[in-house]
Amino acid sequence: MAGHSKWSQIKRTKAVVDGKRGALFTRLGREITVAARNGADPNGNFQLRTAITKARSAGLPAGNIERAIAKGSGQGETASSLELIRYEGYGPEGMAVLVEALSDNRNRTAAEVRLAFSKHGGKLGETGCVSYLFQHRSEVRLEGHCEEEPLLENLLELEAEEYVLQSDGSTMVHGGFEALEQLQQGLHDRGWRVLNWGHCWHPVALMEIQDPHLAETCQRLQEALESLDDVCSVSTNLAPIEQA
């Protein structure tokens, strides 16, 4: 019986992992589809090149990428009706939450996002209620903790804003929203190993929650929003929670 129980747990775990992987692939495909509206050639479409690189890093099969490009560029089928939608709201203790989604049905997505907020002590707000608490920035991740002097020299040339040594051993470079292509291409051309790049919503200031129960509720809200099929990204101003 114990063996059967263990096997059942393995199957359940695999189903959860497969489900999350499938949802991720769906979101990545949608990002490619939207980017491909501006042209099917990634060499001349930076947004598409970014989406493809992100998808390949996550293991999205080449066939899925090709179909997403064809759908977005209108090759052989009806053009995609996906649109980018931003939602803003509050979590426990007034934590600011900014959600970006790609959807072909605004009503469905809004209902799902609203339900996730209400189930986890939050509230969906009006457009603009928390976006002023974030900066929309570019970020480029480099391999390893880079040598400071040559990196600083290159970042000054490229007009980057800052860099941060990450806990995973990489180096994250930040810049203005419009600087993404310049930073990515410039760092690559100067010999740095670029792992990935994209845009992010960076909180102007972080909010600390001392109560571990409330902090956990905030995390569950973020996880619930991230699990929605239409959601691409979830940003909050919650300070990192130190594990005991």
UniProtKB/Swiss-Prot annotation:
Organism: Synechococcus sp. (strain CC9311)
Keywords on record: Cytoplasm, DNA-binding, Transcription, Transcription regulation
InterPro entries recorded: Integrase-like_N, TACO1_YebC-like_2nd/3rd_dom, TACO1_YebC_N, Transcrip_reg_TACO1-like, Transcrip_reg_TACO1-like_dom3, YebC-like
Disulfide bonds: none
GO terms, biological process: regulation of DNA-templated transcription
Keyword Transport: no
Subcellular location: Cytoplasm
Name used for this protein in its record: Probable transcriptional regulatory protein sync_2234
Protein family according to the UniProt entry: Belongs to the TACO1 family.
PANTHER family in UniProt: TRANSCRIPTIONAL REGULATORY PROTEIN YEBC-RELATED (PTHR12532:SF6), TRANSLATIONAL ACTIVATOR OF CYTOCHROME C OXIDASE 1 (PTHR12532)
Principal place of residence: cytoplasm
GO cellular component: cytosol
Keyword Cell inner membrane: no
Recorded superkingdom: Bacteria
Molecular functions per Gene Ontology: DNA binding
